[in-house]
Amino acid sequence: MEKQGLFSALCYLMLNTPLLFSVNATFTEVPKDVTIREGEDIEMPCAFRASGSTSFSLEIQWWYLKEATREMAQELAISAPGNRNKVTTSKDATKISTVRVQGNDISHRLRLSNVKKQDEGVYECRVSDFGDDETQEHKAQAMLRVISRFSPPDMQAAEAVSHIQSSGPRRNNPSSRATPEPGNKRAVPPAENLAPSLSTAASSSASPAPGKAAILRQQHGSGTGPIFANDPALYMFLLIFHQLVYLLLNH
């Protein structure tokens, strides 16, 4: 009984050991979206590992899809047995290259030299896993964007700085701001503040209008400005008062 149990356990391990080392079919390296300038070179990687430890036939095809709709980065499509080439292909799709190997691992890099603007589009790596009973199709896509060789660098940062400066608090015009001269602590008054003073001085130095009398004090050391009188009686009174004061001061 003991030998029979050991024999059964050994048979179980022999039958299930391959399953312990089997892994799911997956991409080990996929192409990524990239942006380059015209005239540059680029490589797009694509590597795949099949499931199980049994040797299969694997095939990689690189396709160029000009106006294809972006799909999932990795997609698994199982076709019916016997229909190995049942793959949905866009009308604008163009096959670039094909590589086929015997085994569980396959890899193929797409190399593009001297890229031009018309090379822009979606590039798709298709892997066909040919098994005994069915064929599995795996796909990985990447977008290639090509910019002009003479295009300026990205200006978003500069535009953001310009936007911040323009949206900041507005200050007075530097021409109207009081700016002290070197060595002079007194600030120069703004231009708009000088305008009323100049107009006042001009009006005070102008001759009086008709009907108005001006009495100028001629006392020594007196810096008093002109005094205007509109009433004739008041004018005579001030004139007499001025003469009396002058006589008193001289005596």
Curated annotation (Swiss-Prot):
Intervals, Extracellular compartment: 26-226
Pfam name, any one: V-set
GO cellular component, one term: membrane
InterPro entries in alphabetical order: Ig-like_dom (IPR007110), Ig-like_dom_sf (IPR036179), Ig-like_fold (IPR013783), Ig_sub (IPR003599), Ig_V-set (IPR013106), IgSF_V-set/TM_domain (IPR051102)
Region Disordered, annotated ranges: 157-213
Residue stretches of biased makeup (Low complexity): 166-177, 195-213
Localisation per UniProt entry: Membrane
Chain ranges of the Ig-like V-type domain: 26-142
Main localization (coarse): membrane
Alphabetized UniProt keyword annotations: Disulfide bond, Immunoglobulin domain, Membrane, Signal, Transmembrane, Transmembrane helix
Ranges facing Cytoplasmic side: 248-251
UniProt topology in membrane: Single-pass type I membrane protein
Disulphide bond pairs: C46-C125
Transmembrane segments: 227-247
Leader peptide range in chain numbering: 1-25
Listed name of the protein: V-set and transmembrane domain-containing protein 2B
Native organism taxonomy: Eukaryota, Metazoa, Chordata, Craniata, Vertebrata
Protein's gene: vstm2b
